[in-house]
């Protein structure tokens, strides 16, 4: 898909972070922009930002929607058609949440919340929008589906189980949709970034009341530590530009990178993830050490060229604590166990 002007884009999770960056980028290309989010205050602020970015107010539609509720998501799709005269030509599903902790400490609520937003909302959107898009645009004009996944789709850790499982499923869904949509003149792209400058570090604040029973240690101090990491993530508009290039060039997997060397090291590491699970633990540890050294060397070279990834500073110990640990009252958990250990 290369011709964006005058067409319609819908971005789930478009009120902040990566989603808002995508809305800005494609709105700047002349698209009519619809964004969906669960928070009205965030939507109101996003509309102001989009207008300030140069997108005409008449080309902006902000919809408060629970993306995990199929009836509500269908209502959202209906509103887009009623407002702009058709379904989106470009569907970008970006809404996501995360919660970190030992997977053996996880509760049903931890899985239901993370999988519900990160996977089920994507399924909902595909099943609601794609039939409409095919009927309206197949063999007539360009259309495309995209989803924001994560590097976590390729490499799970003991503290990211629900999130990594959801993102791995999303990736495979998009591979399937790319194959399925080819006969209709369309395709799919899955964006797999690392750290993004976004509000996902605040996600726990907006966790539904009926899914609050977590097995992880979560409080304002742990969230502050997480926010410190996301504060130095890739700029959402820059990430949106990377996604646009991937869509224009029909890339199925989009891996944002800072330098070619970092990208090459990243790809080799991903290939090793699959290969390593067939090896002994000692062999895996040896390869992991080599990969860390290679990544460190690539990062040092990037720093010399002025293209290094930004560093971050942890908050002070007085007002923060490590995230990714289990609740203290779970007596089957090793109390010293930390994220990905």
Segments the model singles out, each with a brief description of its role:
Residues 2-34:
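Canonical Rossmann dinucleotide-binding motif of NAD(H)/NADP(H)-dependent dehydrogenases/reductases
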Residues 29, 155, 176-186:
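Active-site-adjacent segment of SDR/Rossmann-fold oxidoreductases
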Residues 40-41, 64-75, 108:
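The beta1-alpha1 cofactor-binding region of Rossmann-like NAD(H)/NADP(H)-dependent oxidoreductases
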Residues 102-103, 107-115:
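Substrate-binding pocket helix/loop in short-chain dehydrogenase/reductase
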Residues 126, 166:
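Active-site helix of classical SDR
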Residues 150:
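Residue(s) in the substrate-gating loop at a strand-loop-helix junction
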Residues 179-259:
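SDR active-site lid
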